[in-house]
Amino acid sequence: MEPHTFEQDGVTYEVRFTREAEAWIARIRRAGEATAQIVAFPHERGYDSDDVRASLIAGCEAAVPNLPWAAVTRH
């Protein structure tokens, strides 16, 4: 699946998706940073199978505010 980029509160995030045996895995990272947060969407119940991409993107965008990000530093 193609990567997705979105912005929240002035911060740009990049998401890469991979399909694994038991779930779709989303690796969400702030643009330009090496560290990623991993979110899993289990098959059969973690997303809408009629529109997988849109469902995974919506889940990632909803998860971002609740993930344990390091404080943003601006120089």
PLM region spans:
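Short N-terminal "domain-start" leader segments
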Residues: 1-21
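Exposed, low-complexity/repetitive linear segments and helix-based recognition motifs
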Residues: 6, 11, 30, 45-48, ...
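A short, structured beta-strand/loop element
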Residues: 14-42
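Mixed-charge, Lys/Arg-enriched low-complexity segments
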Residues: 35-75
